[in-house]
């Protein structure tokens, strides 16, 4: 438990934490609430259930919706980052690798590549290793 909450008072970790939270939250809100043109909870879970058991779909939605909230306040940062990292790995392996590296910037691919996911994964791993950084609930709770 000590390692889970421990962190250095790092501005870099704080910036990484907020960057990942800001970028991932809209994706989670699409899945959980139907915001930003998303399918909402039921629609997303039905889509995920075509390929994965319902509990895994539920975990993915939670990771993308609750994870960024945890990151924003620095609560259980390593757990939130791990959940997001898992979602990024699964997305790359199941969906995006076949479309190559690049995002579909020009609309001439049949799908999105995995460059975004690789960036998010790198930030998540940095948070798993380094913790929440400055201005975090984790730092307040750490023994």
Q: Where on the chain are the PLM-derived regions?
A:
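Extended, low-polarity transmembrane helix blocks
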Residues: 1-37, 46, 51-62, 66-143
């Amino acid at each position: 438990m000590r390692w889970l909450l421990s962190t250095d008072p790092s501005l870099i970790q704080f910036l990484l934490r907020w960057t990942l939270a800001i970028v991932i939250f809209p994706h989670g809100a699409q899945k959980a609430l139907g915001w930003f043109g998303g399918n909402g909870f039921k629609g997303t879970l039905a889509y995920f259930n075509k390929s994965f058991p319902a509990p895994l779909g539920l975990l993915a939605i939670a990771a993308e919706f609750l994870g960024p909230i945890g990151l924003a306040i620095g609560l259980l940062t390593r757990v939130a980052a791990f959940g997001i990292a898992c979602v990024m790995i699964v997305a790359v392996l199941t969906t995006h690798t076949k479309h190559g590296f690049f995002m579909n910037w020009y609309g001439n691919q049949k799908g999105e590549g995995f460059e975004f996911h690789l960036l998010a994964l790198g930030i998540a791993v940095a948070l798993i290793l380094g913790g929440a950084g400055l201005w975090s609930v984790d730092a307040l709770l750490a023994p």
